[in-house]
Amino acid sequence: MSSISIIRLQDRPELKDSLARWFHEKWGVPLEAYQESMEDCLTARSAVPQWIAALEEDRIVGRLGVIENDFHNRKDLTPNVCAVYVEEDKRCQGIAGEMLRFICRDMYARGVGTLYLLTDHTSFYERYGWTYFCMVQGDGEDSLSRMYRHVETEFPEKAVPPILK
């Protein structure tokens, strides 16, 4: 079994187009929106947006992003972790948890200690230090969704990409 590494898009900019296409196909958000956000990640000096991926050799097996707002009415709850996804054949191996830990530490190193996440899952994110914060109205949604918050309280020596074995 090969190991899984967590990488920043900034460290592997050649993955931009394949990541943008994948996110577009998975979530239905226009391809151009992902391309623009990822280009901003690569060229802007601000902490947001950010995009990471979990790689098994050259195969992308997990991904997530950090954006200002994940399509909800609480514009004050920012930035948001979005589009957390691990390929089905790689689930239950700790990859999502490692990606979440990595992005929380990486954002803390960039000066952002508090992150928000919109989800309908009721117990998954608590395992990784996220706490339920409030209910929010998703854009175009009839029902409310759960907003979680994560506050990074410790700064590790280095926010280095973890390797899973």
Language-model region placement:
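Active-site rim helix/loop that mediates acceptor-substrate recognition in acyltransferases
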Residues: 24, 28-56, 61
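Conserved acetyl-CoA pyrophosphate-binding loop and the N-cap/start of the following alpha-helix
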Residues: 90, 94-102, 112
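Conserved N-terminal entry element of GNAT/NAT acetyltransferase domains
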Residues: 1-17, 151-165
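Short coil/turn motifs at secondary-structure junctions
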Residues: 69-71, 89, 122
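Short coil/loop residues immediately preceding or within conserved phosphate-binding loops
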Residues: 49, 76, 81, 142
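Conserved active-site alpha-helix within GNAT-family acetyltransferase domains
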Residues: 109, 113, 119-143
